[in-house]
């Protein structure tokens, strides 16, 4: 019969030694102790082989499998970094990506309130980034976008600060950390721009180096159709859009709200381009009804 003490020593050494070195040492020690019992030599060898195999499969193979999976993810991310995936979505698939009617209404209402408050207080603004893309390409909110972006000149920051309480009176929350964020059910980001040489750039330009305007691109501001309302935007948006969103007039990029946010996976979602179809070109719905809240002040 296999010695109980030898088996216990074998298990103790496995759980208390580091890595495969400790594993091999304890296995050798157990093998020596067990096999010295001549009366049970053949039985002990079989038991030892079974035990060794089970432990090898349950530890080494699990580690190996994890490494294979990790390597596969890295390879997939690498491929997507170097090659775009072009996908055509059916109308039914597009509908799955669309924001809800409640979100769409809250975004249009937020844009309407912001436009009226800033205009009423003589603060010049323009739609920016994805909001600008939505106005140019969809004549409204991009159907799978979930926030709003506008820009103002830094000279108007003090005037903006003076009217922030009016946003709060409308039930919005106001936050500030480099950019101003106006939040209800959805949020609107206000970027502060300044002129540097021949460019208008904003305070987090280092993070978005392609988001700038040349003087002739920005001024004079003009109006854009945005759902059921009108908003102000740059004079010539094409240069800015081409820099930020190459092939924006042919393809859409849909970002998943369920991202794992892992650095090596950051390009997986960004590298899928969806061919623009009539359904994808429709703005977020519904466009209204919207309330006239600012005029109540």
Swiss-Prot record:
An example of a Gene Ontology cellular component annotation for this protein is:
membrane
TM regions (residue ranges):
62-82
Q: Which family does it belong to?
A: Belongs to the LicD transferase family.
Q: Where in the cell is it found?
A: Membrane
What InterPro entries does this protein map onto?
Answer: LicD/FKTN/FKRP_NTP_transf, LPS_cholinephosphotransferase, RPE1
Pfam (any one): LicD
Return one Gene Ontology term, BP aspect: glycoprotein metabolic process
How is this protein named in the record? Uncharacterized protein RP688
All copies of the RPE1 insert domain together span 9-55
Q: What are the entry keywords?
A: Membrane, Transferase, Transmembrane, Transmembrane helix
Cite the PANTHER family for this sequence. LIPOPOLYSACCHARIDE CHOLINEPHOSPHOTRANSFERASE LICD
Q: NCBIfam families recorded for this chain? A: RPE1 (TIGR01045)
The GO terms this record gives for MF are: transferase activity
Membrane topology annotation: Single-pass membrane protein
Per the UniProt record, the lineage of the source organism begins with: Bacteria, Pseudomonadati, Pseudomonadota, Alphaproteobacteria, Rickettsiales
């Amino acid at each position: 019969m296999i010695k109980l003490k030898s088996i216990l020593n074998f298990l103790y050494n496995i759980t208390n030694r580091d890595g495969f070195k400790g594993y091999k040492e304890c296995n050798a020690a157990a093998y020596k102790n067990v096999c010295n019992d001549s009366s049970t030599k053949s039985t002990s060898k079989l038991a030892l082989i079974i035990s060794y195999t089970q432990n090898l499969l349950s530890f080494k193979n699990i580690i190996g499998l994890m490494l294979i999976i990790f390597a596969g993810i890295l390879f997939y991310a690498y491929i997507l970094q170097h090659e775009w995936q072009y996908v055509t979505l059916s109308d039914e698939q597009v509908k799955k990506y669309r924001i809800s009617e409640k979100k769409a209404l809250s975004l249009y209402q937020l844009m309407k309130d912001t436009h009226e408050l800033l205009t009423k207080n003589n603060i010049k603004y323009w739609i920016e980034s994805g909001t600008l893309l939505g106005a140019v390409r969809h004549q409204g909110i991009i159907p799978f976008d979930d926030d709003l972006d506008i820009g103002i000149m830094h000279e108007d920051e003090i005037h903006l600060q003076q009217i922030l309480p009016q946003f709060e009176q409308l039930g919005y929350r106001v936050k500030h950390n480099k950019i101003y964020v106006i939040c209800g059910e959805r949020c609107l980001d206000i970027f502060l721009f300044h002129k540097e040489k021949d460019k208008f750039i904003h305070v987090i330009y280092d993070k978005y180096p392609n988001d700038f305007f040349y003087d002739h691109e920005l001024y004079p501001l003009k109006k854009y159709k945005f759902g059921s309302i009108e908003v102000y935007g740059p004079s010539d948006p094409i240069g800015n859009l081409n820099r930020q969103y190459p092939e924006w007039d042919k393809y859409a990029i849909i970002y998943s709200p369920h991202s794992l946010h892992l650095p090596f996976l950051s390009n997986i979602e960004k590298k899928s381009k969806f061919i623009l179809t009539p359904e994808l070109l429709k703005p977020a719905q519904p466009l209204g009804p919207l309330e006239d809240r600012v005029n109540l002040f």
